[in-house]
């Protein structure tokens, strides 16, 4: 079995819930659901993706290595375009497989969007 490399963001939720911001196993990097700052779905999605990018960087990957994302929103009718626009701006070239789902709520009421990402690092 390949070694697991755990990446922490320092979030207070990590030790409480028992998770890592990201885990790298071999050529794969899995980034946990990540929320962002901002007043609307666009800003929160951009912020979440910036945090994901930092975790990927610490794992030796980049946004270009992302092969799948999941976007969770609290009101898909009102938020899908803004969240989708921020996602498109970040992943314009990589164009990962992506799902967007509506959820009843996120961990805090001010959070509108949460993003997960999976990356694959091809052999050099």
Predicted ranges, named:
Residues 1-124:
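Short, polar/acidic, helix-capping and beta-turn segments at strand->helix junctions
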């Amino acid at each position: 079995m390949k070694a697991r490399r755990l990446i922490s963001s320092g979030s207070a939720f990590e030790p409480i819930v028992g998770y890592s911001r990201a885990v790298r196993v071999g050529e794969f990097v899995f980034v946990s659901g990540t929320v962002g700052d901002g007043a609307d779905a666009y800003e929160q999605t951009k912020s979440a993706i910036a945090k994901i990018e930092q975790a990927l960087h610490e794992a030796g990957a980049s946004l270009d290595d992302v092969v799948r994302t999941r976007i969770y929103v609290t009101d898909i009718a009102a938020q899908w375009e803004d969240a989708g626009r921020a996602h498109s701006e970040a992943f314009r070239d990589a164009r990962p497989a992506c799902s967007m789902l509506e959820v009843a709520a996120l961990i805090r009421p001010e959070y509108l969007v949460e993003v997960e990402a999976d990356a694959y690092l091809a052999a050099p």
